[in-house]
């Protein structure tokens, strides 16, 4: 099956004008994807949807970091709630201790 990916191709042409090899990461460049990568518009559960509207199964799931899939409602809600206390804190926080304690309980 061959899909028309003209929008991804156009987005890549735009990207190469402002980013080295058209991406912010070496893994997104043509060395890994051939002529141009697919540009993903959105994701839900185990599915990715490209800029041209095609649906794909996300076999990689962020290299294993998404066991519940993309845009899981409970995860999205937790992220929204957590964002009200700060979006990126490089300082020490209580939640950091709580996560470490949880990991310690789960992995003796």
Regions found by a protein language model. Name each.
Residues 19-20, 50-51, 74-75:
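Short, flexible segments with low predicted structural confidence
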Residues 38-58:
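Active-site and channel-lining beta-strand-loop segments
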Residues 2-42, 102:
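Active-site-adjacent loop/helix segments that line or gate small-molecule/cofactor pockets in enzymes
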Residues 55-108:
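Glycine-rich loop-to-alpha-helix module at the N-terminal edge of alpha/beta enzyme cores
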Residues 32, 45, 64-66:
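Short active-site-proximal "capping" loops at secondary-structure junctions
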Residues 1-2, 82:
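N-terminal alpha-helical segment of soluble enzymes
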């Amino acid at each position: 099956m061959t899909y028309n990916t003209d929008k991804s191709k156009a987005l890549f042409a735009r990207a190469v004008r402002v980013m080295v090899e058209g991406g912010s990461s070496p893994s997104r460049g043509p060395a890994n994807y051939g002529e141009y990568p697919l540009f993903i518009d959105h994701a839900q559960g185990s599915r990715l949807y490209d800029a041209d509207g095609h649906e794909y199964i996300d076999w990689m799931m962020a290299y294993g970091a998404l066991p519940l899939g993309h845009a899981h409602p409970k995860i999205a809600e937790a992220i929204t709630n957590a964002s009200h206390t700060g979006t990126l804190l490089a300082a020490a926080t209580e939640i950091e201790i709580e996560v470490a304690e949880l990991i310690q309980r789960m992995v003796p």
